[in-house]
A protein has these predicted regions:
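Short, well-ordered, aromatic-rich surface patches in folded extracellular/luminal domains
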Residues: 4-5, 20-45, 51, 69, ...
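Sec-dependent bacterial lipoprotein signal peptides
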Residues: 1-20
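Short hydrophobic/aromatic-rich motifs at helix boundaries and adjacent loops
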Residues: 14-16, 59, 86-87
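N-terminal, post-signal-peptide region of Sec/Tat-exported proteins
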Residues: 54-82
Length: 158
């Protein structure tokens, strides 16, 4: 029984250390100063939600619900280490430098979305109005899920 306990403790320690090293590897080179992702959803003639969501390189989240959103005001929170690594992995895989910066159709009422990515000190800005470019969909969904849809964020100042 003592041997089983020792094996379990050793296995747990190995898992903990390996997850720490994978998080460290994932975040390699990423700092709050050189990495952030912001998604801004603009107005239309109707009741389109108007908001912005930002995630910094240290996992800090800020959501600003402006109009026609479930929550108006500025909300803050933080990503878990694993969620932050998920975002960093998406950024690494997105081939950001080779994406077109604009995909705007001539539709007057279509709200403009803007994704601004600062990744390892390089700045990328993308705008679209009639459908997210395929290469950016996973990043957009991640930002929406963790800012606009994130009910665990708290109202700033509370």
């Amino acid at each position: 029984m003592q041997n089983l306990y020792t094996i379990i403790v050793a296995f747990s320690a190995v898992l903990t250390l390996s997850s720490c090293s994978s998080v460290d590897e994932c975040r390699k080179g990423v700092t709050v100063q050189n990495t952030s992702v912001s998604l801004e959803k603009g107005m239309c003639f109707g009741k389109c939600p108007v908001y912005s969501g930002t995630i910094l390189g240290d996992g800090q989240i800020m959501y600003d619900g402006r109009r026609f959103t479930e929550r108006e005001g500025i909300y803050v929170g933080a990503l878990s280490e694993s969620k932050l690594c998920e975002l960093i992995t998406l950024l690494r895989q997105a081939d950001l430098a080779n994406q077109p910066s604009e995909k705007l159709d001539n539709v007057p009422d279509a709200p403009i979305s803007e994704l601004r990515v600062v990744f390892l000190g390089k700045v990328y800005t993308y705008k679209w109005n009639m459908g997210t470019p395929d290469a950016l969909k996973r990043i957009e969904t991640f930002i929406e899920d963790n800012t606009h849809e994130n009910q665990s964020l708290r109202l700033m100042g509370n």
